[in-house]
Amino acid sequence: MGADDTLRVEPAVMQGFAASLDGAAEHLAVQLAELDAQVGQMLGGWRGASGSAYGSAWELWHRGAGEVQLGLSMLAAAIAHAGAGYQHNETASAQVLREVGGG
């Protein structure tokens, strides 16, 4: 917000940020899938209590990482939606002002 408490928004910046977040979420999903495959192979040959304990810890960590990825995706969508809304309102306001001003 500015010094006068006016909210200033640049929809193009919001769209760019949303695209970056979405890209990060997609990259994280790919990396998690690769890591999951590697850990799955490792756990496949690991027997005993330590293997079970690691497997349980891995599942917990993997679930948390998946929630982070989902959160990034949701945040990207929300920011993109808000940016589009601001752009729509800005365009509509400009049109109304042109009509009121006669041109």
UniProtKB/Swiss-Prot annotation:
Similarity remark: Belongs to the WXG100 family. CFP-10 subfamily.
One Pfam family linked to the record: WXG100
Any GO CC annotation of this UniProt entry: extracellular region
Induction: Transcriptionally regulated by the sigma factor SigM.
Protein name (Swiss-Prot/TrEMBL): ESAT-6-like protein EsxF
Source organism of this protein record: Mycobacterium tuberculosis (strain CDC 1551 / Oshkosh)
Database matches in SUPFAM superfamilies: EsxAB dimer-like
Coiled coil, from the record: none
Subcellular location: Secreted
Primary residence: secreted
